[in-house]
């Protein structure tokens, strides 16, 4: 399975036929620019391109009224003056003789993508469509939107495939009030939207775009609005919104499908949005969503934005503005779906595993390399002496293989790796690997988090420990509320993940931790696993490090008071240094 790309050139046919400053930005070039960018970067050829058919009137009727569908169909025969008159009946809308055809293709593209993902033909995908859809309502066009593509796709997934939980993430800079209205009383759809709001003074100027609108009836609590009351929101704001608001809700909701209303006017450079998030940020957001719903993500284009340029450097940073190049935010969002985090060159070896004892049988996924290489014996012994630890012969053999894997990651030859060590040598091996990293990079910036003991403790802003949460809610709060904010704030070159004797993590917990740490470091993770655990952990870790979705943590259970207390203690101590932990508004 791969990534689908859904597009049809006929969707460029509709265009504005009269002067209208408000509507002139909705032009064919908004769509062709996105496709051209994908082609220039070589992403189109890595996707499975799917054909598109028009959505049927029955499929449109999953969301829209028969009268409204008939009205849009009638525009095929109207002249310019009649089209102009009809358009003025709606807010920020224009009609064209090809509007009905284009809008049916746009809805059909979303349906085609959902079918491909839910039948297993592809793992995820992107539909480049026009006109957009998230503002359109049951019987009204609105904000350039004619048919609500994402809402139709969600209803289709429920009706045809029997899905009971669908997450819709709307990161367009405008509130997708059309989607909200359609699902506001439906508990099977969790709708999340961030949008420029400015206390109701930004389009669409609706009080129901505010945070206190949470759905109604049985759907109360399933609408989540995050209104931006100022412009200039950047990468840290978007990441904080995902880590502290969206993802905790999404994990508890446990969706079977994720639909993204992918509007990119929320990126830097768009004059309408006036936000500061770089294109790379959307790649990270997409990768964070991939741990949900078995990785079944369907992104459907809304407002493409102005396609700001971004860095083509091999190591893009989330805290720097984009520089001159030909990359678009749409391309950055697609890259992680193709298992290419951000813009880092793909190493020759994706995943490597080194065993303490050669020839041990492991059931590993295809494409995972059994690494037999080792650092030279003299070099290994020198590192062991430097650490002043007693290594037995078996320990030295395992250390040599671990050093070889580490050098491969640091030199860009290996993306991720799993190494085994003996129980007694785990701590010493980790110490040697840390020293090797410091020697290679010439820096001593180390963030050390220990999961052990019965109480949270802190020795410095870079060294602390926490007890292992025993509930799913506590473990998720630990990852989303502490580990990932620290990882994104620290921006490490790589992650060393040591799973020593009695580490206490269940396989699913270790897999989720590894999967979610891939994004901040571009996949550069070395997992050090105690040899008695390797048979159970190796395949699971290899799968998630390769980009597969981690296994479920099981039924959701609320965090205990003790787990909440430990987390709050650490956050209170660390907040002054780590900005992504600073999510509470200052007192007035």
Curated annotation (Swiss-Prot):
One of its GO terms (cellular component) is nucleus. It is found in: Cytoplasm; Nucleus. Its EC number is 3.5.1.48, 3.5.1.62. It catalyses: N(8)-acetylspermidine + H2O = spermidine + acetate; N-acetylputrescine + H2O = putrescine + acetate; N-acetylcadaverine + H2O = cadaverine + acetate; N(6)-acetyl-L-lysyl-[protein] + H2O = L-lysyl-[protein] + acetate. GO terms for biological process: DNA repair; epigenetic regulation of gene expression; homologous recombination; macroautophagy; negative regulation of DNA-templated transcription; negative regulation of transcription by RNA polymerase II; oligodendrocyte development; polyamine deacetylation. SUPFAM superfamilies: Arginase/deacetylase (SSF52768). Keywords: Autophagy, Cytoplasm, DNA damage, DNA recombination, DNA repair, Hydrolase, Metal-binding, Nucleus, Phosphoprotein, Zinc. InterPro entries: HDAC_PDAC, His_deacetylse, His_deacetylse_dom, His_deacetylse_dom_sf, Ureohydrolase_dom_sf. The active site is at residue 135. One of its GO terms (molecular function) is acetylputrescine deacetylase activity. It is an enzyme of class 3 (hydrolase). Residues 1-302 are annotated as: Histone deacetylase. It comes from the Eukaryota. Polyamine deacetylase (PDAC), which acts preferentially on N(8)-acetylspermidine, and also on acetylcadaverine and acetylputrescine. Exhibits attenuated catalytic activity toward N(1),N(8)-diacetylspermidine and very low activity, if any, toward N(1)-acetylspermidine. Histone deacetylase activity has been observed in vitro. Has also been shown to be involved in MSH2 deacetylation. The physiological relevance of protein/histone deacetylase activity is unclear and could be very weak. This is Polyamine deacetylase HDAC10.
